[in-house]
Amino acid sequence: MTRPDSGQPATSPAGARPIDFAELRGPVVRQVGQLMAGAAMTAPKSGGQLLTAGSPAFLETVLVEDPTTLLRLAEWMRARGAERREAIWFRDADAAQALDGVLFIGLVNPYPPNYDCGACGYATCAEFLHATKQQRADSAELEFTGPTCTLRNVDLGVAVGSAARTAALHCVDARCQTRIAVAARKLGLIHADLAVALSLSLTHKAITFDRRMPDIDYDALTLASTETLPVAVPGAIRADGARNKQQPRQPTPRRTRRPPAANP
């Protein structure tokens, strides 16, 4: 230990032990990450009585804190950013390498709660499952699998919020992200169809905030394909609300103006 004001070795009275910051980070993040996972698991869920009746749990929690694994996540994210031509993937990849850990919370085979609420656009849960079965199977090549029951998406949000609150109570910096979750899913670290990552760090300044977007020369990159859709291609039609031109699997029809109605 050194004194921050002088750079000289710190001295302590007999019986007092200075706290080594480097030794503190790992154990604290590990313990708080486990508490966060517990908070996610006990968070309220739609149709919770199904779980007490023996239905399988659909919420997955995975804690990653190994630097080698964090590097694998970062490298995949850079490859994904190259094929989507989006600098934000590179920005998040740089942060991933510097994290003390990541808690992934996701939905695995999230069956509906049988409320027949209609929020998905179908009259019943059974109708939703039947109508979207092939669509879910076809979405394996996308970043996440879908569509997912709307109420289960709400459940995921509640679980993530409970976990984030637990991190805040213990003063561990946490930020909700999806790109790291995509990387974890594609690398087989998690099995969730849809997931959110909570980036964890114990530093003097939160490393996942106030980050600048890097300048990337995409044409100079030679990164392997992630075999994930969509990807950026020249000439792709920018869909309404899209940030970049990504190639959809189904062509997006161009909107045309309706001719003015003739005066009677």
Over which residues does each language-model region extend?
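Acidic, surface-exposed loops and disordered segments
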Residues: 2-264
